[in-house]
Design a protein with these regions (language model features):
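Bacterial Sec-dependent N-terminal signal peptides
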Residues: 1-22, 346
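Glycoside hydrolase catalytic-domain context in secreted enzymes
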Residues: 20-830, 838-854, 863
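Short, structured beta-strand-loop surface elements
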Residues: 858
Length: 865
């Protein structure tokens, strides 16, 4: 029996040895040794391929295809049936980094589970379903006009740092593990925050060293040194004349030499091509690739036509050395080994996470809890909130965001199994017969479209003829034909087919009809799509694009009475993008608020759910409505159509609870007059509607605090393209409508006099602070205690700057003492003499309270020797 056992053991050892033909395939060796061995076996062309974010397979060595690009901004993006948490700007309002950690631990569970399930079903590593997630975005939200500020954790470097570190630790897993759970990515390095429409060409050269080291770099430094983030993404723009992805000051002297970063630098997508196409600092792709690799950019992201495929030619022409490529390749390959991607799933613990964990009950509860904690109560006149359910006979829910589930998902989002809208949340608290709903108006447009689709006809059928092919180029057999007599709105979200027999991926469609105009007029086509989209009228192309997001387009078109118009839409699903298409056309008529007011004659209380959406603000978007440009905003006021409707409701004597959904600050000065209560709900994720209803009806006491300044008007803002911090954020501006750190509660907290263990310390000492807090009200609630520091007589420094915070919960009538420990770095500021961040001797003011507003703060003073 023992002989048989020995033979079996030797047999399996033999199999293992045969399977491990090369040293790099041996999981018992260190990652560096394995990477060196693999590099020694690669050709120069193969090395270049492995430095592209879509790394092709190398079959002769058993190297599988690998994609570096996935997104997990607030859940696994571009995937169905995942948990969609609130947008990061909303999470920042919770001031709860412990909850943020739990959320991103859940997100990394879902990524791993979906990834391995996909492989088990025979799939391959693909874009948007991989082990490298380009999250978090830790750029400072310095200006509310920036469309991507919603992806960040606000305007303050310390808050950004606390939240960003929690994100990375949740995504990457414990440092004690042999294999990383995922690779997280700190982006966009550095000094990056719009304008979106100019990001490929702008040269930012007005950032003084103080702003650089006190504002723009701290979060990146912390994620590198404290969270061991494994990837850093360099940005599109130029900083002081050099593109960020070719900027040796940023990538070598600061990132690697000062901070000791030893992992992967990845370019933003297409940023290296910008060297020669937009920035004009390189003559062509060959020289751009050479500049980037020498400057320290290891991995190139691009849609196609990678500049890094020119690296072998660059070596042959002596522009770079092969050792330069090997240096970057070592970092990239060690990443793949550390993720366990080169090893069998059987020895990678993270591969055991079951797919049943995706959007499970625990994750849904986390999404709901974060949505609740993210809500900020900005105004509550005469304590109109919370509403008493039993006393409500009828309530109106009005507004363009009341039933918009897609708005709640924000951007860089996945698709949940179920989304609870605000209307649904309110109905769940009352009953359908007590709730009246009307959209009221659109987000921006002050006109409504009277659809003409019913007036169209094709092949003796009303509306559009829809023809489908299971190819992307309208070729092959037709697999389905339908007739659509209503506005087109189709999606594959939730695994829905466009038509029976049409695949979820790799299909194309044509929608055709004829329209005879009844009069001379200007009509408008309204459309949006993810994928390839083209609209033709009488064979003339009116709009044509490829896009990975569904964004609204409005195309005016003049028609003549009696003339026939052949309308054709060509659509194709592309890449692994989810398929979406929306289309309508007709005449526009002015909104008549009087009709709505008549419908509300017996209703006194209105919940208006408005604001913005990810279709208006976001990343480099072809949006050109008044007040919006290229994903950014040109003013920060509430769109006039919503403002006018709120005025009409006020003039009709209605009590108004305004729920503002946006990823950025809105100047709500007029709304403080027209509205009785204002709730800032951000883009609250899949359970956002229930969280909003919980707050409105008092089932949850709001505790969120603003992570950004809400200005009074656009007139208070400096030039968008000026990156100086002067006049920006609470640190250099103090005339806000609603200040950073502000947020009301249904209870009242009394903050007592703080005690410090010392009033004089040395530069390397800690300072301990004790602050008594009492809940003076009738409700259990949570409060966020905030600590700010200012260097006395620092005339060009910040008014104050956040250095610590704690979120506490207290029952009504209860008290506690909150303990803070300020480490020495809390007193670091930029020193012009040394050119470094350092602690200098002198007096320091410490402010403490529940917002950054002067009247909400108390002060004490200490001295540092």
């Amino acid at each position: 029996m023992n002989n048989i056992t020995t033979l079996v053991f030797l047999f399996f050892i033999s199999l293992s040895i045969n399977a491990q033909k090369y040293l790099f395939q041996n999981p018992d060796l260190g990652f560096e040794e394995r990477a060196k061995d693999l590099i020694s076996r690669l050709t120069l062309d193969e090395k270049a391929l492995l430095l592209c974010d879509q790394s092709e397979a190398i079959p002769r060595l058993g190297i599988k295809k690998f994609n570096w690009w996935s997104e997990a901004l607030h859940g696994l993006a571009n995937n169905d049936s995942v948990t969609v948490f609130p947008q990061p700007i909303g999470m920042a309002a919770s001031f709860n980094d412990e909850l943020v950690y739990k959320i991103f631990n859940a997100v990394s569970d879902e990524v791993r589970a979906k990834y391995h399930e996909h492989l088990r079903r025979g799939g391959e590593n693909k874009r948007f379903l991989s082990l490298s997630v380009w999250t978090p975005n830790i750029n400072i939200f310095r200006d509310p006009r920036w469309g991507r500020g919603q992806e960040t954790y606000g305007e303050d470097p310390y808050l950004m740092t606390r939240m960003g570190v929690a994100v990375v630790k949740g995504l990457q897993g414990p440092d004690t593990s042999k294999y990383r759970k995922l690779y997280a990515c700190a982006k966009h390095f550095a000094v990056h925050s719009g304008p979106e429409w100019k990001r490929h060409e702008i040269n930012i050269n007005d950032v003084d060293p103080r702003d650089l080291y006190e504002t723009y770099l701290p979060a990146f430094k912390a994620l590198v040194k404290d969270a061991n983030v494994r990837e850093v993404m360099c940005a599109y723009h130029r900083l002081d004349d050099e593109p960020c992805c070719g900027n040796t000051r940023l990538l070598e002297r600061i990132l690697r030499d000062e901070w000791g970063f030893k992992y992967i630098v990845v370019s933003d997508c297409g940023a290296i091509a910008d060297f020669y196409t937009n920035h004009k600092v390189s003559s062509d792709a060959l020289h751009a690739a050479s500049k980037a690799i020498i400057s320290g950019t290891d991995l190139e992201c691009y849609w196609n036509n990678y500049t890094y495929k020119n690296l072998p030619l660059a070596v042959k022409r002596n522009l770079i050395k092969e050792e330069d490529i090997d240096k970057s390749l070592m970092r990239v390959l060690m990443g793949r080994f550390e993720l366990g991607e080169m090893d069998p799933d059987s020895i990678v613990p993270w591969s055991k996470i079951p797919v049943s964990i995706v959007n499970n009950k625990e994750h849904r509860e986390l999404a709901l809890e974060m949505a609740r904690q993210s809500i900020v109560l900005l105004q509550n006149k005469n304590n109109i909130l919370p509403l008493n359910k039993s006393s409500i006979k009828k309530i109106a829910v009005i507004g363009p965001n009341a039933i918009d589930s897609v708005m709640q998902w924000g951007n860089y989002n996945g698709k949940p199994i179920k989304t609870i809208t605000t209307l649904e949340g309110i109905i769940s608290k009352l009953s359908p017969d007590k709730v009246f709903y009307d959209k009221g108006c659109d987000l921006v447009e002050d006109k409504v479209t009277k659809s003409y689709i019913q007036q169209c006809e094709f092949e003796s059928q009303k509306g559009f003829k829809a023809t489908y092919w299971n190819t992307r180029d309208f070729s092959g057999d037709i697999v389905a034909v339908q007739y659509i007599s209503h506005p087109i709105k189709l999606t594959t979200a939730g695994l829905h087919e466009f038509a029976p027999g049409v695949k979820l991926e790799g299909f194309s469609a044509k929608y055709q009809t004829e329209f005879v105009a009844s009069k001379n007029e200007e009509i408008v086509f309204k459309c949006g799509a993810t994928g390839f989209f083209e609209l033709l009228v009488n064979g003339e192309s009116l709009i044509k694009y490829e896009n990975w997001r569904t964004l609204p387009s409005r195309i005016p078109f003049k028609v003549e009475a009696g003339k026939k118009y052949f309308i054709e839409i060509r659509y194709a699903q592309l890449y692994n993008w989810q398929a979406n298409i929306e289309f309508d056309f007709g005449s526009e008529v002015d909104i008549d608020y009087s009709d709505l007011i008549k419908k509300l004659k017996d209703i006194d209380l209105v919940v208006f759910v408005g604001g913005l959406s990810g279709r208006l603000e976001g990343e480099e978007m072809p949006v050109s409505y008044p007040g919006f440009k290229g994903g950014d905003r040109t003013n920060i006021e509430l769109p006039s159509v919503q403002r006018n409707l709120l005025k009409a409701l006020k003039q009709a004597g209605k009590k108004i609870i305004f729920v503002n959904c946006s990823g950025s600050a809105i100047a709500l000065t007029p709304e403080t007059e027209t509205c009785d209560a204002i709730i800032q709900a951000w883009y609250p994720g899949e359970s956002g509607g229930l969280a909003i209803a919980d707050v409105i009806f008092g089932d949850y006491n709001p505790s969120g605090k603003l992570p950004v300044t809400f200005y009074k008007s656009s007139d208070q803002l400096p030039d968008f393209e000026n990156y100086s911090m002067k006049g920006r954020t609470y640190r250099y501006f103090n005339d806000a409508l609603f200040p950073f750190g502000y947020g009301l509660s249904y209870t009242t907290f009394k903050i007592g006099e703080a005690k410090v263990d010392k009033t004089e310390i040395n530069a390397n000492e800690q300072l301990n602070i004790s602050i008594p807090v009492t809940n003076m009200g009738k409700y259990k609630g949570a409060e966020v205690l905030q600590i700010y520091v200012k260097k006395v007589n620092d005339h060009d420094g910040p008014i104050k700057t956040l250095r610590d915070f704690k979120r506490i919960e207290l029952e009504a009538g209860k008290s506690t003492v909150v303990q803070f420990t300020l480490n020495s770095n809390a007193f670091e500021f930029y020193d012009w003499n040394s050119g470094k961040m350092m602690i200098t001797s002198g007096d320091y003011e410490i402010f403490y309270g529940n917002s950054s507003r002067k009247e909400d703060l108390k002060a004490l003073r200490i001295k540092i020797n």
